[in-house]
Design a protein with these regions (language model features):
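DUTPase catalytic domain/fold
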Residues: 1-172
Length: 172
């Protein structure tokens, strides 16, 4: 069963929520605070840890009224203001908000497994047409579903646990 936005808040699954604008019917909106563009290749070995590709920070345009990223078509790593703490009986994915999709952007999310936790969630975004995205714009939404209980020893303990991305902070 998919949780409602209110249930997600009550269970403390998402942190740093914009409680005024971010709670939706079936999820929580996520605000972007950092964007880096893919600029090299990676390696997925048979054994061992993934070698990540290179990502280059995208500079923010700063105007008196707003701060934003001007994005050209490409593949981007994104960092959100919100964090998460996934309990042992839930899993989560992210999807783009319809406004981003209408502008030619698609969020590419893997599953956030039971036991995963971070102060700032991250995901990936494919941009198909040039677009401007403002700092802290709500571009993604959580989808949290109940699962069978995962045993303590089987909870997520992978290489991305508690990873902190370096993010750009907007200036106003």
């Amino acid at each position: 069963m998919q949780l409602t936005g209110r249930e997600i808040v009550e269970r403390g699954i998402i942190t740093n929520i914009d409680e005024e604008n971010g709670i939706q019917q079936q999820g929580i909106d996520l605000r972007v605070i950092g964007i880096r563009k893919l600029s090299g290749g990676g390696c997925m070995p048979l054994f061992g840890k993934t070698k990540l590709p290179n990502y280059s920070p995208v500079e923010m345009e700063v105007e008196p009224e707003r701060s934003y990223w001007r994005l050209e078509p490409g593949y981007y790593e994104i960092t959100f203001e919100e964090g998460c703490k996934i309990p042992s009986n839930l899993a989560m994915t992210l999807i783009q908000r319809s406004s981003l999709l209408r502008c030619g952007g698609i969020i590419r999310s893997s599953q956030f497994d039971a036991g995963f936790s971070t102060d700032h969630m991250g995901s990936f975004m494919e941009i198909l047409h040039p677009v401007e995205i403002e700092y802290q714009a709500r571009i993604a939404q959580t989808i949290v579903v109940e699962t069978a209980e995962v045993r303590q020893e089987d909870l997520y303990h992978g290489q991305w646990a508690e990873q902190q991305n370096v993010v750009q902070r907007g200036r106003f």
